[in-house]
Amino acid sequence: MVDSYDDSLDGEKSKTQVKRELHALVDLGERLTTLKADVLAKLPLTDALRKALAEAPKHTANIARKRHILFIGKLMRDQDQEAILVLLDQLDASTRQYNERFHNLERWRDRLIAGDDADLEKFVIEYPDADRQQLRSLIRQAQHEVARNKPPATSRKIFKYIRELDELQRGLR
């Protein structure tokens, strides 16, 4: 016997594919519940979805939270998911960029505390607004703290100073 192939199903999505897409919408909705209000304000969302997202933190019981997340997923069907995903990707990229800059400043602090005058010179070249005398004093204090196993209070001051210089150089201050 020969099975006949029906061409009418070619354009339709399978049940599994539809379920995957719905789960993706629920996951996206759950991700939206973790965002702050100022970020949500930038997203193109309907009023019903904004209201549901605002109510999400009120649902603390597991089953109630799960039911509310599924409701948000249902509301996500009426949204422009591509625009939301693009904005969330931009947010993730800016977060990664911020984290990378933060880690770079931490590396500078560690190099200055552990290093010698060559590292200080490199830092002053990269950040010409740096007060060399103040920085040397902070570095010396931090090195004394490390030698005496004290809490790194001066190390935090150095990081704060480096961050202020970085923000000044980037025009953020």
UniProtKB/Swiss-Prot annotation:
Transmembrane segments: none annotated. One of its GO terms (biological process) is assembly of large subunit precursor of preribosome. GO terms for cellular component: cytosol. It comes from the Bacteria. Keywords: Cytoplasm, Ribosome biogenesis, RNA-binding, rRNA-binding. It holds the Pfam family DarP. Belongs to the DarP family. Member of a network of 50S ribosomal subunit biogenesis factors which assembles along the 30S-50S interface, preventing incorrect 23S rRNA structures from forming. Promotes peptidyl transferase center (PTC) maturation. This is Dual-action ribosomal maturation protein DarP. HAMAP family: DarP. It comes from Pseudomonas syringae pv. tomato (strain ATCC BAA-871 / DC3000). GO terms for molecular function: ribosome binding; rRNA binding. It is found in: Cytoplasm.
